[in-house]
Regions:
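C-terminal and late-domain segments of enzyme folds
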Residues: 4, 126, 131-246
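Short clusters of hydrophobic/aromatic residues that line enzyme substrate/ligand-binding pockets
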Residues: 59, 114, 138, 142
């Protein structure tokens, strides 16, 4: 819906995995769709039933299939494609190495991860996030410092990485968004930082900005929703992605 409202033609793909044949057919279909797409979006919302231990692992397993990996590599390196992952999709992009490295690769001990919320349970609320960098095509319609009220709903959203890695992400402009308090200041305090993400990081990008992952559900907002919540709620992510190809 969010992409269609932004002017895109969106195809929803459902992975079928009840049999080995169904998996093989799903892989073949996914490869075909990637080769005929300009944008690949990995959704959240308890994708795959949030199993096993967070559905990002299931999504990542599919994308590590050699045929799909090859299609994604060609999609990013030769066709200037864009990728977006929200919530579970963000988890998958991180587990694949697409974030923050921009390619599907084996992870190292210092690679960033998304782990369990500090409070040890699921959180569902509205939080404020601030645009830190708009080097990504996904954020071309906003400016650094802009603040948006966005929904969160997750159990494993805490961004964690060694401090040296995080500093490098900031230096490269790859930290896209942070959780902030009512004064617009990044914070580690609940409920403003709902999961305890280090440096209040909510979303990051690949080095070239074309792969973007975030925990907050920007796709949930429609006009007339959250009427009792103040603040700007439209991050213009989807229209930015679509406009990139115009």
């Amino acid at each position: 819906r969010a992409f269609e409202e932004a002017g895109a033609v969106a195809d929803v793909f459902i992975i079928r995995n009840l049999t080995a044949q169904a998996i093989d057919e799903s892989v073949e279909k996914m490869v075909s769709m990637i080769k005929n797409s300009q944008i690949v979006m990995l959704p959240g919302g308890f994708s795959a039933g949030d199993e096993p231990d967070g559905s990002g692992k299931f999504i990542a397993t599919m994308f590590r299939n050699p045929r799909i990996k090859e299609a994604v590599t060609e999609f990013l390196n030769e066709r200037d494609g864009l990728m977006l992952g929200i919530c579970n999709g963000f988890q998958a992009l991180v587990k694949l190495g697409l974030l923050p490295y921009g390619e599907i690769r084996d992870l190292e001990t210092e690679s960033p991860t998304l782990t369990f919320n500090n409070i040890g349970r699921h959180v569902s609320q509205i939080v404020d996030t601030r645009i830190v960098s708009n080097k990504s095509p996904w954020l071309s319609e906003v400016e650094p410092g802009d603040i948006h009220a966005v929904a969160v709903s997750h159990g494993e959203g805490r961004f964690y990485a060694p401090e040296s890695v995080i500093k490098e992400l900031f230096k490269n402009g790859q930290v896209a968004t942070q959780y902030v308090d009512p004064q617009g200041v990044p914070t580690m305090e609940m409920p403003y930082n709902p999961n305890g993400s280090l440096y209040a990081i909510e979303g990051i990008t690949s080095p070239d900005g074309r792969v973007f992952g975030k925990m907050c559900h920007s796709e949930r907002f429609v006009d007339g929703l959250y009427r009792n919540i103040t603040g700007n709620k439209d991050q213009k992510i989807f229209v930015s992605g679509v406009n990139y190809f115009k």
